[in-house]
Amino acid sequence: MYIEMAQQQQQSGSDNSMAPVWIVILLFITAYFVWALAHQYIVSFVFTINIWQARLVNLFLNNQLLANQIYLMQTLDPNTVNWDQMVTVMRAVGDYMRYPVICILVVLAFVLYNSNVTLKYRKTYDMKSLRAQEQFNWPAIMPIVKEDLVSQDVNKGPWAMALTPMEFARKYNLLRKDDALLDNPVPGEEMTAGIRRGDAKRVFTMQLGPYWDGFERCSPQAYALSAVFMARMNRDRDAANNILKVLDKTFVDGKPDFSVARPVMKKYQNSELVQEVVAKHAYVLTVIASLLEAAREDGVVPSSEFLWLKPVDRRLWYMLNCVGRQTPYSEVAGPFAHWKAEKEMGRRSLVPMIDEAIRALEIAVKEVRLTPRQMEELEP
């Protein structure tokens, strides 16, 4: 049984090997019958195409031989034209058509050569030259085009990265011994530090900044960004983009033109949407954070669109950068916690509500293990 099945499979395999041959034979037979049955229609169609080609060429050549070929194709009965005669007429017209076709192909080759991506993009860029070119397409990067941030210390200067919770606690001397040191500590044993809650409350309260007293009392950068957010809240993207574009360009010159925001501010500061936001917050930072949040109902408003703000007003930058995050940076944990509390209550609060910021800092510090030597450096 197994031998018979194997023989059948071999036989079917050999039969399949002849399939291309049979397909070619079938195509020839089909072509023959099509020519035999539809001979006059094929000749008529081919002659029609060649007549139009010949007429087009003869408009420029005015050649009598070509005119004769046109007359011949128009007067011949398709039923009397055989295959050889049709090919002869097509070749005669083709002798004239080859030249315009060659010209067209040369033009297309030239176009294809110039549109080739590999040949078009032959200039090599490094990061400096690329950002220098792209700053006109992306004006938001203008403030950092001349900066060499890669070679700078990420923990120093106006462009320094945000402090981690432990770095923040060390900077403001908020750490204290939380675990009692053992009389005979085990070598390599790790412990955790605690937070001076009173000092932490003072630091986070100071982060809140000034009370809200109207847009005219805001800093120039807060005033300008408020106008941007108001414009987006009222679906005026052109005005918002214009303010940001002007600020990007003028910041590079060292003199940011914040006055560009004044017309937009006057137009929208008394609108119902803006006044509804302002009425629910007591601090400048919390008001502007809610303006940004409301502006995002019109679409994306990333903090990367106002990079110039970071070296100008670091606290406002990080406050706006944290809008939309679940967890803020320690540098703005106080105003962020207060902002969340005001949003939850639906009204303004002059009393700092920063307990959640203190609790979050404690949790973050507890996650960092310290060696006994590091613990000894801390005060109780």
From Swiss-Prot:
The keyword Transmembrane applies. It is found in: Cell inner membrane. It holds the Pfam family DotM_C. Exhibits patches of positively charged residues, which form binding sites for acidic Glu-rich peptides. Component of the Dot/Icm type IVB secretion system (T4BSS), which is used to inject bacterial effector proteins into eukaryotic host cells. Part of a subcomplex which recruits effector proteins and delivers them to the core transmembrane subcomplex. Forms the interacting surface for recruitment of acidic Glu-rich motif-containing effectors. One of its GO terms (cellular component) is plasma membrane. It comes from Legionella pneumophila subsp. pneumophila (strain Philadelphia 1 / ATCC 33152 / DSM 7513). Keywords: Cell inner membrane, Cell membrane, Membrane, Protein transport, Transmembrane, Transmembrane helix, Transport, Virulence. This is Type 4 apparatus protein DotM. GO terms for biological process: protein transport. The chain crosses the membrane at residues 18-38, 99-119. The T4BSS is a complex nanomachine composed of several subcomplexes. This subunit is part of the Type IV Coupling Complex (T4CC), a subcomplex composed of the DotLMNYZ core and the IcmSW-LvgA adapter subunits, linked by the C-terminal tail of DotL. Six DotLMNYZ hetero-pentameric units may assemble into a hexameric nanomachine, forming an inner membrane channel for effectors to pass through. Interacts directly with DotL. It comes from the Bacteria. It is a multi-pass membrane protein.
